[in-house]
């Protein structure tokens, strides 16, 4: 199995003068779900190279065993140093795609034409996709082959209004994920702030927050395996000829 993980290249938190980027747990936790299962992982970002880490995600209160493992993993860090440019990757080379979150994706991946076309290409090929937290915002312009918005009528989740309010960034982000999904006609599913929550609707798998990133990756991997199962046909019945 081959998975493409797409990470933000955006490092400015609106006009606050503070840094943002990807959220470390949302990269590290899915990364090891895939790696420990023997999945081949490719990392990409809009600009390529080393993507920006949201420094807050590496503060002691947000560190986990997996974020610490990632930081000590020379191979993982080497991959992160050399992410591919998003415009250089093709859907045909992968079985699935996963979008870690962080606030950064709301500024770049939500509007990136290569990201939008790539998601559309995966879905058109019948391949499941996984997205967590703020990266659900990267679905806002994705369309179906008939021109209908992907999320219209779809059940999705992502970083909630309540969670955004709790981190004090409601007035900073370019849009609120929950409000945007509802505006676009999605059925927005959520649990209490910071609870694990993963939603599957067809080929689309979404997770609510950082704690949902590992379960979302596991759900995505199961969906890829299920799709790859060979169809078992019944053996033909042999009827004895009679004179």
Regions found by a protein language model. Give the residues of each.
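Extended, subdomain-level signal for the structured scaffold at the beginning of enzyme domains
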Residues: 1-125, 137-243
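Conserved, well-structured core segments that form or line functional sites
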Residues: 129
